[in-house]
Regions:
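RNA-binding basic/glycine-rich loop and surface signature characteristic of RAMP-family CRISPR effectors
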Residues: 1-212
Length: 212
């Protein structure tokens, strides 16, 4: 595998325009509680964000993509193809205590008609929640850096257009968010020691990152 020439780290601040439904699979308080970390704080996993972005780029996991791919050989004479993702996405955490709420729902049958005796409730985060996450691009020898930048720009545009949504119930308008601020920093062999602090949130705050 080619050597990494540069790491580009982006710090993105976001605001949710609609409620968010991100289930943990736990039903302690409702039939579907919000995903929380070990400190009981809500978050959205980086893998979930990455999945939404890949879907927006319309790339299958077997197609060459900024986010990696894996393709099995068609015959014994051929070799498997693949590449690890050049894009890392951190979990999305919230900057302050978001507003929780509980919504009642009813199950639908195959004809999309409500089944009144099958009601359930879900825990959600209300719109207006503020959060942030990191994106990191590893640029290697022979990579098309401009194409990578284009894909990132396309992803950001997709977020702000409401086409990349997070969580469940997206068809009901949930999970819409906008990027309010982006800051980026490049790490090369000239400043690679600084990479140790790349995910230090205080560093980005001290750099004067503010919402648009």
């Amino acid at each position: 595998m080619s050597a990494i020439l540069k790491r580009k780290v982006l710090y993105l601040k976001v605001r949710f325009i609609s409620p968010i439904s991100v289930s943990s699979g736990i039903d302690e308080w409702t039939d579907s509680d919000v995903l929380r970390d070990c400190d009981d704080k809500p978050f959205i996993s980086g893998s979930s964000i990455a999945g939404a972005m890949r879907a927006y780029l319309e790339k299958e996991k077997t197609e060459p993509c900024l986010m990696g791919y894996s393709k099995r050989a068609k015959s014994d004479k051929d070799k498997d193809e693949g590449r690890m993702s050049a894009l890392f996405i951190s979990d999305l955490t919230f900057d302050e205590n978001p507003v929780f709420n509980i919504r009642d729902n009813v199950a639908l049958n195959d004809n999309k008609v409500s089944v009144t005796e099958n009601k359930f409730d879900i825990e959600i985060l209300e719109s207006g929640a503020l959060g942030h996450f990191f994106m990191e691009i590893a640029i290697r020898e022979n990579d098309d850096e401009e194409k990578m930048k284009h894909d990132i720009s396309k992803i950001i545009c997709g977020i702000n257009a409401g086409e990349i949504r997070l969580g469940s119930k997206k068809t009901r308008g949930f999970g819409v968010y906008k990027v309010t601020c982006i800051q980026e920093y490049d790490y090369t062999k000239k400043n690679y020691l600084e990479y140790a602090d790349a995910y230090d949130e205080k560093k980005w705050a001290d750099a004067g990152v503010s919402d648009n």
